[in-house]
Amino acid sequence: MEAAVLRVKRKRGADPADALILSCKRIRTEDETKESSAVTTQVFRLAATVKSENEPLHKYVREAISRNQSCLTLRPSSESKQRIQEELRASKEAERQVSRYRIISSHRPNSEEDNVGASHLIGCSSQDVPSETQDEAEATEATKSHISSPFQLFDMVQEEPEQKYLEKDSEPETILCNSIKMIREHLTVSEAGQESEHREYVDEYVYDIYYSEASQHGWIQDILYVQPYTEEQELVSEEPEPEEIYEDEDDENEENNWRNDYPDEEDSDREERYIGYYEDGDEEEKSAGHAWKMYHRSSLREIGDDDENADLY
């Protein structure tokens, strides 16, 4: 099959996810055993964000596939698929309250008969399924022009978190300056300004286009859940990068530290020889000076004795 596409409708002020993980049931083939997993996960990467749902998706999807080499790090390795699936199942209930994706329509390529409206919350029971909404009607009209597209298309809506998760403390923390309580009204002026500034586009919607390359398991059906892909360790290289060591950070007690380098034995022997030579030279100079003084004194004595004898005669 060709690439599958998720078109997610979200408010302009919300942040899009870099990637989505879609989990769905997989149809077993005759060659597969019963022990093989009946659930498969697929990663959808963010290709582009468009302002209108009527914009053609072909160019964005094909451009994203052409630069797929720079996005390969978003694909989870085969060893980590099982771990990701278990972690997502464990935290599915909590994450669902934070970010919910509701499917409003599903369209297979080049087949109008197979197009199905899927108005339900992913992972919820049939009691939570709402009736047809305005989003479904808009998506149905918008996807009529994409029925002949060469990829499977799912229209979704990113719903906002529940209000109980967004509630803040009724009494904000007191701000003190030099033990004096500050007036909070001066701080809320800027917040009001920001709210009025963003009021123009807070209710506007944009559409995030996510794509996934051809799947080996056929069409995507029986979707279990769609969650943001948040495994940060899968998005970076597992090889640690060498850290820079600065001179003021190295340990002087380490054996390989440059400050602890000792001179070679040959240099030490040569130093000792020259030190002995200089010491011997100093002793010889001292002895020669002492002998000269003794000779000088004896000479003076002899001269003095000769002068005394001359006076006697």
From Swiss-Prot:
Extent of Basic and acidic residues compositional bias? 78-96
Which GO BP terms sit in this record?
A: developmental process; protein transport
Database matches in InterPro entries: SLC7A6OS, TF_Iwr1_dom
Where does it live in the cell?
A: Cytoplasm; Nucleus
Regions of compositional bias (Acidic residues) in chain numbering: 232-255
Q: Which family does it belong to?
A: Belongs to the IWR1/SLC7A6OS family.
Organism, per UniProt?
Xenopus laevis
Specify where the region named Disordered lies, as residue ranges.
Answer: 76-96, 127-151, 232-272
Q: What is this protein called?
A: Probable RNA polymerase II nuclear localization protein SLC7A6OS
Annotated function: Directs RNA polymerase II nuclear import.
Q: Which UniProt keywords apply?
A: Cytoplasm, Nucleus, Protein transport, Transport
Cellular component, GO, one term: cytoplasm
